[in-house]
Amino acid sequence: MFVYCLNNPICRIDLYGNVSEEAAKEKIEENKEEIIAAGKEFNVDPAIIAACIYVEQVLNVNWMDSLSDLLCYSFDTSIGIGQVRVSTAILVEDNGYMEQSQGFYANQLYISREEVVATTLADDKANIRYVAAYLAYWQDRWSDTLDISNMPEILGTLYNLGDNANEPNTSPKSNGFGRHVGVAYGMMKMLLYKRVGNRGVQYEIN
Protein backbone atom coordinates (compact mmCIF):
# COMPACT_ATOMS: atom_id res chain seq x y z
CA MET A 1 0.00 0.00 0.00
CA PHE A 2 1.44 3.38 -1.01
CA VAL A 3 0.58 6.96 -0.07
CA TYR A 4 1.80 10.25 -1.52
CA CYS A 5 4.85 11.77 0.13
CA LEU A 6 5.03 15.54 0.66
CA ASN A 7 1.78 15.89 -1.37
CA ASN A 8 3.70 14.72 -4.44
CA PRO A 9 1.88 12.06 -6.52
CA ILE A 10 5.22 10.95 -7.97
CA CYS A 11 7.02 10.54 -4.65
CA ARG A 12 5.34 7.68 -2.83
CA ILE A 13 6.07 5.82 0.37
CA ASP A 14 4.95 2.37 1.36
CA LEU A 15 3.02 2.45 4.63
CA TYR A 16 4.79 -0.79 5.51
CA GLY A 17 8.10 1.04 5.24
CA ASN A 18 9.63 0.06 1.91
CA VAL A 19 10.97 2.47 -0.70
CA SER A 20 9.22 1.93 -4.04
CA GLU A 21 11.22 0.88 -7.10
CA GLU A 22 10.07 4.09 -8.82
CA ALA A 23 11.41 6.24 -6.00
CA ALA A 24 14.69 4.30 -6.01
CA LYS A 25 15.09 4.83 -9.76
CA GLU A 26 14.41 8.54 -9.34
CA LYS A 27 17.11 8.67 -6.66
CA ILE A 28 19.59 7.19 -9.12
CA GLU A 29 18.61 9.62 -11.88
CA GLU A 30 18.84 12.59 -9.51
CA ASN A 31 22.40 11.59 -8.58
CA LYS A 32 23.67 10.10 -11.83
CA GLU A 33 26.33 12.76 -12.41
CA GLU A 34 27.77 12.13 -8.94
CA ILE A 35 27.65 8.36 -9.48
CA ILE A 36 29.47 8.58 -12.82
CA ALA A 37 32.06 10.97 -11.34
CA ALA A 38 32.66 8.66 -8.36
CA GLY A 39 33.10 5.72 -10.70
CA LYS A 40 35.79 7.57 -12.62
CA GLU A 41 37.49 8.74 -9.43
CA PHE A 42 37.74 5.26 -7.91
CA ASN A 43 37.91 3.18 -11.11
CA VAL A 44 34.64 1.39 -10.37
CA ASP A 45 31.90 0.72 -12.93
CA PRO A 46 29.30 3.45 -12.22
CA ALA A 47 26.47 1.03 -13.01
CA ILE A 48 27.65 -1.24 -10.19
CA ILE A 49 27.71 1.73 -7.81
CA ALA A 50 24.20 2.63 -8.91
CA ALA A 51 22.97 -0.96 -8.64
CA CYS A 52 24.25 -1.29 -5.06
CA ILE A 53 22.54 1.97 -4.12
CA TYR A 54 19.33 0.97 -5.90
CA VAL A 55 19.13 -2.41 -4.18
CA GLU A 56 19.90 -0.86 -0.79
CA GLN A 57 17.07 1.62 -1.37
CA VAL A 58 14.56 -1.06 -2.39
CA LEU A 59 15.49 -3.79 0.08
CA ASN A 60 16.99 -2.10 3.12
CA VAL A 61 15.65 1.45 3.38
CA ASN A 62 12.30 2.53 4.73
CA TRP A 63 10.85 5.94 5.43
CA MET A 64 11.82 5.68 9.11
CA ASP A 65 15.50 5.52 8.13
CA SER A 66 15.41 9.11 6.90
CA LEU A 67 14.15 10.14 10.32
CA SER A 68 16.48 7.96 12.36
CA ASP A 69 19.83 8.27 10.52
CA LEU A 70 20.79 11.57 12.09
CA LEU A 71 19.53 10.49 15.51
CA CYS A 72 21.85 7.49 15.71
CA TYR A 73 25.34 8.96 15.59
CA SER A 74 26.34 7.09 18.72
CA PHE A 75 25.61 3.76 17.04
CA ASP A 76 27.26 1.98 14.12
CA THR A 77 24.24 2.55 11.94
CA SER A 78 23.80 2.50 8.16
CA ILE A 79 23.33 5.99 6.78
CA GLY A 80 22.29 7.72 3.59
CA ILE A 81 21.64 6.91 -0.02
CA GLY A 82 24.01 3.93 -0.07
CA GLN A 83 23.28 2.81 3.51
CA VAL A 84 26.98 3.02 4.41
CA ARG A 85 27.82 2.02 7.96
CA VAL A 86 29.92 4.40 10.02
CA SER A 87 32.48 1.63 10.64
CA THR A 88 32.66 0.92 6.89
CA ALA A 89 33.37 4.57 6.12
CA ILE A 90 36.12 4.59 8.75
CA LEU A 91 37.61 1.40 7.25
CA VAL A 92 37.64 3.06 3.82
CA GLU A 93 39.36 6.13 5.29
CA ASP A 94 41.91 4.09 7.24
CA ASN A 95 42.85 2.20 4.07
CA GLY A 96 43.61 5.43 2.23
CA TYR A 97 40.63 5.61 -0.12
CA MET A 98 39.18 8.71 1.51
CA GLU A 99 40.65 11.49 3.62
CA GLN A 100 40.51 10.62 7.31
CA SER A 101 37.81 12.38 9.31
CA GLN A 102 38.87 13.94 12.59
CA GLY A 103 37.04 14.64 15.81
CA PHE A 104 37.11 18.16 17.14
CA TYR A 105 36.00 20.38 19.99
CA ALA A 106 33.12 22.82 19.48
CA ASN A 107 32.29 25.12 22.39
CA GLN A 108 33.98 22.70 24.80
CA LEU A 109 31.92 19.83 23.43
CA TYR A 110 33.88 17.04 21.74
CA ILE A 111 32.50 15.91 18.39
CA SER A 112 33.80 12.39 17.83
CA ARG A 113 35.20 11.05 14.58
CA GLU A 114 32.16 8.78 14.33
CA GLU A 115 29.83 11.77 14.57
CA VAL A 116 31.79 13.61 11.89
CA VAL A 117 31.61 10.57 9.60
CA ALA A 118 27.89 10.15 10.23
CA THR A 119 27.24 13.78 9.34
CA THR A 120 29.27 13.38 6.15
CA LEU A 121 27.39 10.23 5.15
CA ALA A 122 24.08 12.09 5.38
CA ASP A 123 25.10 14.06 2.28
CA ASP A 124 24.22 12.14 -0.90
CA LYS A 125 27.27 13.25 -2.90
CA ALA A 126 29.69 12.29 -0.12
CA ASN A 127 27.86 9.05 0.55
CA ILE A 128 28.14 8.04 -3.11
CA ARG A 129 31.91 8.56 -2.97
CA TYR A 130 32.10 6.26 0.06
CA VAL A 131 30.06 3.63 -1.81
CA ALA A 132 32.49 3.84 -4.75
CA ALA A 133 35.52 3.81 -2.46
CA TYR A 134 34.26 0.73 -0.62
CA LEU A 135 33.70 -1.12 -3.90
CA ALA A 136 37.22 -0.09 -4.97
CA TYR A 137 38.51 -1.49 -1.67
CA TRP A 138 36.97 -4.87 -2.48
CA GLN A 139 38.26 -4.82 -6.07
CA ASP A 140 41.78 -4.17 -4.83
CA ARG A 141 41.55 -6.72 -2.03
CA TRP A 142 40.61 -9.42 -4.55
CA SER A 143 42.83 -8.27 -7.41
CA ASP A 144 45.65 -10.75 -6.78
CA THR A 145 43.18 -13.66 -6.84
CA LEU A 146 40.43 -12.66 -9.26
CA ASP A 147 39.43 -9.58 -11.24
CA ILE A 148 35.91 -8.87 -9.94
CA SER A 149 35.65 -5.35 -11.38
CA ASN A 150 33.16 -6.55 -14.02
CA MET A 151 31.23 -8.91 -11.71
CA PRO A 152 28.32 -6.92 -10.26
CA GLU A 153 26.86 -9.93 -8.41
CA ILE A 154 30.12 -10.53 -6.53
CA LEU A 155 30.85 -6.88 -5.79
CA GLY A 156 27.28 -6.49 -4.59
CA THR A 157 27.69 -9.51 -2.32
CA LEU A 158 30.92 -8.17 -0.84
CA TYR A 159 29.36 -4.72 -0.40
CA ASN A 160 26.51 -6.34 1.50
CA LEU A 161 28.47 -8.84 3.61
CA GLY A 162 31.42 -6.67 4.57
CA ASP A 163 33.52 -8.35 7.26
CA ASN A 164 31.40 -11.50 6.98
CA ALA A 165 32.50 -12.09 3.38
CA ASN A 166 34.67 -15.04 2.40
CA GLU A 167 38.35 -14.55 1.69
CA PRO A 168 39.27 -13.94 -1.97
CA ASN A 169 38.94 -17.09 -4.06
CA THR A 170 38.61 -18.12 -7.69
CA SER A 171 35.03 -19.43 -7.39
CA PRO A 172 33.05 -16.78 -5.51
CA LYS A 173 29.33 -17.20 -4.92
CA SER A 174 26.80 -14.39 -4.79
CA ASN A 175 24.18 -13.96 -2.07
CA GLY A 176 20.63 -12.68 -2.49
CA PHE A 177 21.69 -9.03 -2.35
CA GLY A 178 24.40 -9.61 -4.93
CA ARG A 179 21.98 -11.35 -7.27
CA HIS A 180 19.63 -8.37 -7.01
CA VAL A 181 22.57 -6.11 -7.92
CA GLY A 182 23.26 -8.29 -10.95
CA VAL A 183 19.64 -8.06 -12.07
CA ALA A 184 19.58 -4.27 -11.58
CA TYR A 185 22.92 -3.68 -13.32
CA GLY A 186 21.62 -3.36 -16.89
CA MET A 187 18.77 -1.09 -15.87
CA MET A 188 21.16 1.14 -13.94
CA LYS A 189 23.43 1.45 -16.97
CA MET A 190 20.47 2.67 -19.01
CA LEU A 191 19.40 5.15 -16.31
CA LEU A 192 22.90 6.59 -15.95
CA TYR A 193 23.54 7.13 -19.63
CA LYS A 194 20.06 8.06 -20.82
CA ARG A 195 19.92 11.32 -22.75
CA VAL A 196 16.73 12.96 -23.99
CA GLY A 197 17.14 15.01 -27.17
CA ASN A 198 15.34 15.97 -30.36
CA ARG A 199 15.45 12.36 -31.50
CA GLY A 200 13.89 11.10 -28.30
CA VAL A 201 15.62 8.97 -25.70
CA GLN A 202 19.16 7.96 -26.63
CA TYR A 203 21.88 6.22 -24.67
CA GLU A 204 25.53 7.10 -24.37
CA ILE A 205 26.98 3.96 -22.83
CA ASN A 206 30.73 4.01 -22.35
Which residues are covered by each model-predicted region?
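Short turn/helix-capping motifs enriched in Asx and small/polar residues
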Residues: 1-21
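Polar low-complexity intrinsically disordered regions
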Residues: 13, 205-206
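Catalytic glycan-binding domains that act on GlcNAc-containing polysaccharides
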Residues: 20-204
